[in-house]
Amino acid sequence: MPIVLWVVSSFSLRAQEKDFATWANAGFEYKLKPAFTVSGGLEWRTKDDLGKTDRWGLKVGGSYKLLPFLKLGAGYETHYRNRGADGWKFRHRYRLEGTLSARVQRVKLSLRERFQHTFDGHRDEFRLRSRAKFAYDIPKCKLEPYASAEMYNGLNKTEHFGVKRMRYRGGITLPLSERWEADIFYCRQWEKDKRKDIVGV
């Protein structure tokens, strides 16, 4: 309980700038072996209440199922971002992650820990992202609702592992075919001085 109160209070002491955005993603996963999967995707994000494109993104990655309950992964992303008066700029990111998962009857639980390093030639940003996710497999229904909470901790020298961002997300996944799946979601993102409401697919 004290931890929850600390996280909430850290984002509620100052007036926040608000924004509404959309995120659109299209990607694929392909199993090279039963335990090894490669993936890739394209991303488009908006900002300023849908008025401007925020960024385009390209990502590739792979994951390996080390144990029935443990998956390890790594990946690379590049972002082409709208920096306003500074124009459009590239930045790059690599990530390393591990995911623990379990199933209790129809309830699916997972905990993912992700280290990421983001850089643009001028600034390096190091983050540890911790995400807890809950999903429910509805009997005789293809829809699968889920909810997750994710915390970003700063790893740069002066950040002292402080909470830099929180994301609360709820959505529904729907298989469209044997190889395609849709994910429709709403996400509330909190930072120290801004809040963002996001609808995505």
Predicted regions and their residues:
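Bacterial Sec-dependent N-terminal signal peptides
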Residues: 1-20
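Start-of-domain marker
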Residues: 16-65, 71
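Solvent-exposed loop/turn segments connecting transmembrane beta-strands
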Residues: 16-23, 46-55, 83-89, 119-126, ...
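Outer-membrane beta-barrel architecture
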Residues: 27, 61, 97-99, 131-135, ...
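Residue-level signature of outer-membrane beta-barrel architecture
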Residues: 30, 64, 100-102, 136-138, ...
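Repeated loop/turn-to-beta-strand initiation elements of outer-membrane beta-barrel proteins
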Residues: 35-40, 69-74, 105-109, 140-144, ...
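Transmembrane beta-strands of outer-membrane beta-barrel pores
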Residues: 42-48, 76-82, 102-106, 115-119, ...
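Outer-membrane beta-barrel "beta-signal"
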Residues: 98, 197-201
